[in-house]
């Protein structure tokens, strides 16, 4: 090699000496080859990797997003399996010094990955896992390990030998390593598939958390035993064990309080100072260096520090946002290049592939069995158990790094390492596709009957699911429940769902609050919400039944919990309560509910017009409700719910039926017009009470409708509208062009617009 000046052996190790020429090059113009300098070569390697990775992403885009697959393929292409067959290329791009630099960046990348993923894991969640997840975790730890060892013995004996050049001891070690799993990998995959707050996702995460706890305990025990066996000086072994315990204690009782101090010094809503971030990086490097000094893998220090990091922002997820971009964009290419350099596919024959895959297949099947048996015993649906089995079989960067650690310590050969990485890459991609398709099939919720207010019999109990995202929304929700409460007859069933964003938790949660709140404890925010609903239920025991839930989920999939509860509880209508300041992600939540709910959906925009029923006697209250009826299924559903509200003694209902200049329905669809006419006739016949007024208003164009709303709108406390209407209605023409929130429909959107300057609360309904 051109840069080598001396090669010699010392202590049985080959030493390679090169002259130090600096990190940066003066450039081609001054007669220097930039590829002989560390920095230009590193930048070129990262650039080439990025080109390959983006190219694979583009080619695979029609089939979905496969980040792990595209990264591994790019790394393998840069290694000896593809381009690396050219010796000149390897000598230019990956000579000895550049490989050392790549491997150094690879280690730094993985310790950062360990930290930013582990610092989002809330260890308190282990207390909340159920009995099934606990059993799953134990069996996931035991069964793949045992079955893997038996499979290694049988393959070696029945097939007369394992893969060529792989001794039996190494083959057994491959089986042990293959049985490992990582919570962080499953968390990342479920997050990308938007399955974190699904039932299979929760079970998989909880089971993996138990498995990881057992694995780390076993890992520490194995390290302690290895130190005692390998070190002839028992006092030195004991001393190293003590230093390991001291490291954990220092991280827990020195580093953690320091990070808590940084958190408390950071104003709420602000990100960490750059100086604080630098201190945390120093703590990370100290932890990893200490782990290396006391005989532990360097990433163990990163994992322990991540677990000790406070989970509340600006730490936890805040750190991930701060460091993540640099890690995934700059360090990750170095990591994958280092992996690809050690994979040479030309070493494999079909005989080797079959033997390796037989072993890996047995271990994967063992993981499926470990999930399926207890799940079926606890009456989990078969397809849910199969789905969880596929999820826990997905592998990722953590698994690859464990393979690399074993390769570095010469416990497995280059052939075994390549087989494990390729198998993890290919099979995990297949499993991700299977999980995605299976879940899409399972998540289609088709109710066996029409679940709407219109089709709910008058004598049957109305079942309402009301969801909200903050404590301030509890009062308007209870106001709406009070208005929906029947004076006599079957009780109203209410399912109250408190929606919390998944930003301070490691696991999505769906909590069913069934126990009374202890009066001797300081109530949390959740407890205060639950207590408010329970107090309302006690006050109206004969007419209202309330169940409370808390759903902690990512914003993008928050609707999944609402839809699941609505389906399981067979609700007739879901009501989402929002205040006037609607955020962009809340509009996404509205759209998801409107598209996916198995029953009717209502969007309630509270503007403070409804009174607080807790402090004013019902006899002294008058609630004025207006209903705008154009026609169509949504308007019929709205009218059915308005009729229910009108049965409340404090409600005065006024229905505006909008007709054209000829006094007939503006709809062109004759079937819908006939349905509307039948509903209107029944409504007028059965609701001739003094508290209900029915008016027909002739509207020629949108300007007349705006004049009506501007004139009458503020006379009401609540205005009810349908969301969807027939397209190209003359009286709605042009209203959608200045839309503020099209999820409410044209009329609902106009009611909350700033142009009309109305203060009425709005309830928009979709059947």
UniProtKB/Swiss-Prot annotation:
Molecular function in Gene Ontology: antiporter activity
Main localization category: membrane
Subcellular location: Membrane
Top-level lineage group: Eukaryota
Coiled-coil annotated spans: none
Tissue localization of expression: Specifically expressed in pollen.
One GO CC term, this protein: membrane
InterPro entries (alphabetical): Cation/H_exchanger_TM, CPA2_transporter, Na+/solute_symporter_sf
Keyword vocabulary terms for this entry: Antiport, Ion transport, Membrane, Potassium, Potassium transport, Transmembrane, Transmembrane helix, Transport
Transmembrane segments: 39-59, 63-83, 99-119, 135-155, 173-193, 205-225, 242-262, 280-300, 323-343, 371-391, 415-435
Cited Pfam families: CHX17_C, Na_H_Exchanger
GO biological process: potassium ion transport; proton transmembrane transport
UniProt entry tagged with the keyword Membrane: yes
Keyword Metal-binding annotated: no
Topological type in the membrane: Multi-pass membrane protein
PANTHER family in the cross-refs: CATION/H + ANTIPORTER, CATION_H(+) ANTIPORTER 26-RELATED
Record-stated family: Belongs to the monovalent cation:proton antiporter 2 (CPA2) transporter (TC 2.A.37) family. CHX (TC 2.A.37.4) subfamily.
Function: May operate as a cation/H(+) antiporter.
Name the record gives this protein: Cation/H(+) antiporter 27
Species of the source: Arabidopsis thaliana
């Amino acid at each position: 090699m051109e840069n080598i000046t001396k090669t010699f052996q010392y202590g049985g190790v080959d030493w390679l000496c090169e002259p130090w020429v600096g990190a940066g090059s003066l450039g081609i113009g001054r007669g220097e080859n930039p590829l002989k300098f560390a920095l230009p070569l590193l930048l070129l390697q990262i650039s080439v990797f990025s080109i390959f990775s983006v190219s694979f992403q583009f080619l695979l885009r029609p089939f979905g997003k496969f980040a792990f697959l595209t990264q591994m393929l790019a790394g393998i292409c840069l290694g000896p399996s593809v381009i690396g067959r050219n010796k000149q290329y390897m000598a230019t791009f990956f000579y000895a010094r550049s490989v050392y630099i790549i491997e150094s960046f690879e280690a730094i990348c993985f310790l950062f990955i360990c930290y930013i993923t582990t610092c989002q894991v809330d260890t308190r969640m282990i207390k909340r896992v159920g009995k099934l997840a606990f059993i799953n975790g134990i069996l996931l730890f035991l069964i793949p390990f045992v079955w893997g060892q038996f499979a290694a013995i049988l393959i070696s004996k029945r097939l007369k030998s394992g893969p060529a050049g792989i001794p039996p001891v190494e083959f057994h070690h491959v089986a042990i390593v293959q049985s490992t799993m990582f919570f962080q990998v499953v968390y990342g995959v479920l997050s990308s598939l938007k399955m974190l707050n699904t039932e299979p996702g929760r079970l998989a995460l909880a089971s993996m958390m138990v498995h990881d706890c057992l694995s780390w305990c076993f890992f520490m025990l194995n390290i302690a035993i290895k130190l005692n066996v390998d070190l002839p000086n028992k006092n030195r072994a004991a001393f190293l064990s003590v230093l390991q315990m001291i490291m954990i204690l220092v991280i827990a009782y020195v580093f953690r309080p320091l990070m808590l101090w940084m958190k408390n010094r950071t104003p709420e809503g602000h990100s960490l100072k750059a100086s604080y971030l630098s201190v945390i990086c120093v703590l990370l490097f100290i932890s990893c260096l200490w782990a290396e000094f006391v005989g532990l893998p360097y990433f163990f220090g990163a994992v322990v520090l991540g677990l000790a990091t406070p989970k509340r922002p600006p730490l936890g997820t805040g750190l991930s946002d701060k460091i993540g971009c640099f890690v995934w964009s700059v360090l990750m290419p170095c990591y994958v290049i280092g992996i690809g350099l050690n994979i040479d596919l030309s070493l494999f024959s079909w005989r080797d592939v079959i033997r390796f895959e037989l072993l890996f297949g047995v271990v994967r099947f063992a993981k499926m069995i470990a999930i399926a048996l207890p799940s079926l015993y606890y009456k989990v649906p078969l397809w849910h158990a199969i789905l969880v089995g596929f999820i826990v079989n997905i592998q990722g960067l953590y698994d690859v790094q464990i393979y690399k650690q074993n390769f570095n310590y010469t416990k497995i050969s280059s052939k075994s390492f390549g087989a494990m990485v390729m198998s993890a890459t290919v099979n995990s991609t297949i499993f991700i596709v299977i999980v995605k398709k299976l879940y899409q099939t399972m998540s289609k919720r088709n109710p066996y009957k029409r679940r709407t207010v219109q089709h709910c019999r008058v004598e049957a109990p109305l079942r309402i699911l009301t969801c909200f995202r903050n404590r301030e929304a509890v009062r308007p929700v209870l106001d709406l429940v009070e208005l929906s409460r029947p004076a006599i007859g079957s009780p109203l069933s209410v399912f109250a769902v408190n929606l919390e964003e998944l930003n301070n938790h490691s696991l999505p949660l769906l909590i069913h609050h069934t126990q009374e709140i202890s009066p001797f404890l300081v109530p949390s925010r959740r407890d205060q919400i639950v207590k408010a609903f329970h107090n309302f239920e006690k006050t109206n025991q004969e007419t209202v039944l309330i169940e409370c839930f808390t759903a902690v989920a990512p914003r993008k999939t928050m609707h999944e919990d609402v839809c699941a509860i609505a389906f399981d509880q067979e609700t007739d209508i879901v009501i989402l309560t929002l205040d006037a300041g609607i955020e962009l992600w809340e509009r996404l939540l509205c759209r998801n509910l409107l598209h996916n709910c198995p029953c009717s959906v209502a969007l309630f925009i509270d503007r403070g017009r409804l009174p607080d029923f807790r402090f004013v006697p019902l006899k002294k209250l008058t609630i004025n409700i207006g209903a705008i009826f154009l026609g169509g299924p949504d308007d019929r559903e709205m009218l059915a719910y308005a009729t229910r509200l009108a049965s409340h003694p404090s409600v005065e209902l006024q229905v505006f039926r909008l007709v054209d200049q000829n006094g007939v329905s503006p709809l062109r669809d004759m079937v819908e017009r006939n349905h509307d006419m039948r509903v209107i006739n029944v409504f007028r016949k059965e609701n001739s009470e003094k508290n209900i007024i029915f008016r027909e208003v002739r509207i020629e164009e949108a300007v007349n409708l705006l004049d009506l709303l501007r004139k009458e709108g503020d006379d009401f406390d609540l205005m009810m509208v349908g969301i969807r209407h027939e397209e190209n209605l003359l009286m709605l023409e042009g209203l959608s062009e200045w839309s503020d929130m099209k999820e409410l429909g044209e009329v609902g959107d106009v009611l909350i617009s700033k142009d009309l300057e109305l203060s009425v609360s709005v309830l928009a309904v979709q059947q």
